[in-house]
Amino acid sequence: MATRVDRPPTQAGVLILLLVGFLVPVCVSAQQAIIPLQLSFSDPGARSMGFGGAFVALADDATAAFANPAGLVQLLRPEISIEARSWNYSTPYTEGGRAEGLPSGLGIDSTVGLRTSTSDYDATALSFLSVAYPKDNLSLALYRHVYANLEFYGETQGLFAGGSDCCYIRYYDQQMASQLDFVAYGLSGAYRVGDRFDIGLGVVYNDASLSASTTQYSSDEDTTESYFSPNSYLPSRTVTTQRQFVDDSDWTLTVGFLWRLSERLRFGGVYRQGAEVKVGTEETAGELIDLGVPPGGVLYRATGIPIEFPDIYGFGIAYQSPDGGLTVSFQWNRVEYSDIPASLELDDQTIDDADELHLGAEYIFLSSTPIIAVRLGTWLEPDHQMRATVDDPYTRALLQPGDDEIHYSAGLGLATQRFQVDLAMDFADRVDTFSLSAIYNF
């Protein structure tokens, strides 16, 4: 909603919580909320990260339980794997500016086009833990993997439209916050079918927790000066608050294979089913406008809204040099982000499926003690922000297409007969990731 003003202003706005990386929209009443979620579908382990995520055709340690369960059958001894990760998020969102038209030049309505800002958040967590046990042609593994650990906070200040004829429009300013935790627990198994072919299957329990809120504020006073001034977010000027919440789980499947084409060349693939969870939402009244209920009273509540997370297909090929020192690996992932708007039956916004390309290399100094490995990698993360498919200026202002990102990674590993330690870094515009992992076999 928006109201126009001839010079003395009255306001209205639209409730919307902004776009980043990976987004889940929830339609509520005549308004719309978009919750920023930044999920990582990268494989666990610092070794995989050093390869730029090109690991599905290798999958030769306990992290294969997630990356490609077929790889577990390559293990010679039981293994315990543990990983800690640190994430430095920089989540972009539209802060204000012009949804359409030229600025009036009054107060904060002075920007041609849109203003953007970022929500910065740092997190550290035990991101992966697994235990793998091989026996003859069969291997089993249990694991825990963190998909997401993210908090977001943002404020809008003065998103305007109109002004070409008689009227200026200022949408409601908003304070937005969300917290997301998404963890997977899995049991994976692998079986050696023949000398050259392995298959794997995983059963995954996905546990999702989300808390998000957006509060709309009118300008501080009903004056022209205040209409074009920064918002102080006064409690007495709140219009509505909308909350979204998830506390749900789902069971999914993972299947994979490894095919040794020759002694030096191998081909692998994996399919990972996306989870479906239920979202609840409610809208409550603020203090400014009489909406028929007291401030804090519920205007709308709904539960059980299904959201499907993407299915993922991955195929890769890896080559090892005759002396075993150099390994080069390539992987293609298809991430079906369009499952999200399709599950919500949205017709005014969409997300494109993404074709990720991963490339990495490892060189091992075989004569060193302990054995030292260095790794370099890169991968393409295509744009997968929710974008508007309608001509409404406000929706288009907040649901803008994003940019493709190139990630660059590097890693270092030390290995003895029983113990392996790996360190890796992955750098991109929206998130930098650091990983430290260890594997012990016994």
Where are these regions (language model features)?
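Bacterial N-terminal signal peptides
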Residues: 13-25
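Short hydrophobic "helix-edge" motifs at membrane interfaces and signal-peptide entry regions
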Residues: 16, 57-59, 185
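N-terminal, post-signal peptide beta-strand-biased segments of exported outer-membrane/organellar beta-barrel
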Residues: 27-146, 401
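N-terminal secretory signal peptides that target proteins for export/translocation
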Residues: 1-9
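Outer-membrane beta-barrel porins/channels
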Residues: 31-48, 123-442
